[in-house]
């Protein structure tokens, strides 16, 4: 599928529908905005999404979800498998969105990502909350031990 049709995924019932018809022109315009705003490297919005690199696919997905103006974004491993440049771009967009008041639930195995993007870290091990941490006062090593089952003395 083309990039612009991918941008409509999950949003057909809202922004891109007028009665029984899809508003392709609106989807194409939003796709061009996402390409520009999120620095998606592509020759155009009509190419297949599979033709993009993994990093550019991730940036397109983040842009698509942000364009929907959510009140909560669940970002599960948003930078897994992407290059350093795409990772930095995605991190910056998440920081901007959080600064604008978007609630972001970040799920990641990348400890530096968790510490760098979070304003609060909650660690769950085997279904139980084991730690409630301030990312400005935790090291990746400490966070890793909580992820492996160590319990914080007082968990909120």
Predicted segments, located by residue:
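Glycine-rich phosphate-binding loops of nucleotide-dependent enzymes
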Residues: 1-156
